[in-house]
Amino acid sequence: MKRYCLIFAATTLFSFISPKTLKGTWQFAGGIYNGKKEGAPEGYALQRKYTARHYQAFVIEKGAKPEKYEAGDYALNGDSCIDTETFCSQPSKIANIPIPYLYTLRNDTLTLKGTLPTGMQVQEYWIRIR
């Protein structure tokens, strides 16, 4: 009986431990921007490849070479993900500005929710593909 209680307690505790990284490849599945719901783009995909502390974002079009459009650093702290864009292929108002997001992981879905420095409220959904 003690053994079962110990196993139950350990399982319960481990279920509350957050991952230390987002390592892997994630594909954009849609989001909510200032209250307006938007689906994933059609005809191409947006993917982020996370390492232990950095990420690179790509536009993936069938038959074309992936095009990097963004890169940056991130850090996980509790339920927060601090994202700092260090490269953008387009002019950006958020370059080198740390942006805190509330993040959640459920199964293979990453949700990032926060407010950009421009005031825009975002909630994005990313699906792990690798």
In which residue ranges do the predicted regions lie?
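Sec-dependent N-terminal signal peptides
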Residues: 4-13
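Lipid interaction determinants
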Residues: 13-69, 82-130
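Phosphoinositide-binding peripheral membrane targeting modules
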Residues: 72
